[in-house]
Amino acid sequence: MATSAVPSDNLPTYKLVVVGDGGVGKSALTIQFFQKIFVPDYDPTIEDSYLKHTEIDNQWAILDVLDTAGQEEFSAMREQYMRTGDGFLIVYSVTDKASFEHVDRFHQLILRVKDRESFPMILVANKVDLMHLRKITREQGKEMATKHNIPYIETSAKDPPLNVDKAFHDLVRVIRQQIPEKSQKKKKKTKWRGDRATGTHKLQCVIL
């Protein structure tokens, strides 16, 4: 693995938001990405954010990832986070038909909050390791992604993980393509939660 020094300053920061129904594995994906461990059970009422220095395509960046709660009662809070997000991973479980059907709702909400006709997003079909429980096919997932003109990726947070790093990195690549100025200058830091107590921020450095 190649090694290089992490630039000390002027790194672009990408605020990535992980959204989707409760129980689809948002926290498992996020924790696998940052800590390289699989956590099967996680408190769904907790919103948490993580920081990570990462080199993607020979460009260093800081990823500030927010793992949102999936419950409906958190929808107003989630909308607040969406206003500051640079890109979104819309996650559903291939074992949960309802979570797949709700992809439309999340996509529409993001565009409404952003007041845009398009915005950097990736559709993430999670829990593909549970083949015996799968209800949503790859073809259905791809059709949904094509409908919304966003990339599609299948993931599993269970060890050995599948496409977890790639999902987050691909979203950064989409942001760089659609919002090129993001890769050129350091973004002013903003809080995810306003005055609300924040979750644990973990700062890591990786080279990929």
Curated annotation (Swiss-Prot):
GTP binds at residues 21-28, 38-40, 42, 44-45, 70, 126-127, 129, 156-158. Its cofactor is Mg(2+). It holds the Pfam family Ras. Changing residue 71 to R: In NS11; promotes SMP complex formation. One of its GO terms (biological process) is Ras protein signal transduction. Component of the SHOC2-MRAS-PP1c (SMP) holophosphatase complex consisting of SHOC2, GTP-bound M-Ras/MRAS and the catalytic subunit of protein phosphatase 1 (either PPP1CA, PPP1CB or PPP1CC). Interacts (active GTP-bound form) with both SHOC2 and PP1c (all isoforms) to form a tertiary complex; SHOC2 and PP1c preferably bind M-Ras/MRAS, but they also bind K-Ras/KRAS, N-Ras/NRAS and H-Ras/HRAS. Interacts with RGL3. Interacts (active GTP-bound form preferentially) with RGS14. This is Ras-related protein M-Ras. The gene is MRAS.
